[in-house]
Amino acid sequence: MQEEEIAYRAINFCNAIGLTTSKRRRKRYDMFFESLSIYGVTLDVMEDKDWEALTYDLTIGHCDPASLTITVPNKIYVNACLGEEHALAVIFHELGHLLLGHKPVLHFSAKEPTRVEDAEWQADTFADIALETIGVRTQQMSFDFYM
């Protein structure tokens, strides 16, 4: 999937659920997370100890497209509710998997997948664009200074 299509979906999602830059004054996202159930999405929050025992702390989020379930450890959920950028990125990344229609498949090929074929890149891009749209993350500007 091309970046333009991902951007279209991310921006439309944010607009559809009412999370836009103008509504950024709200510092807690718990009501938004709870409202996902209206759309059939379950946000399953696991106790940190249970998460660590299950995943060996090798991941910080999981998405099951078959059941429309996103599972995260409690520390990610709590920080995301408070608007912490990294925690929000984790949840929006997992939402990206769902909203972009990803299925759990293995890549069987002699070549690495291209960037646009990579589901992780797509979910990261979705999260980046969504976070920009809601005013959490802004594009960093860099200036080249020559002496």
Predicted feature locations:
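Active-site hotspot residues in diverse enzymes, especially metal/ion-binding acidic/histidine motifs
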Residues: 1-147
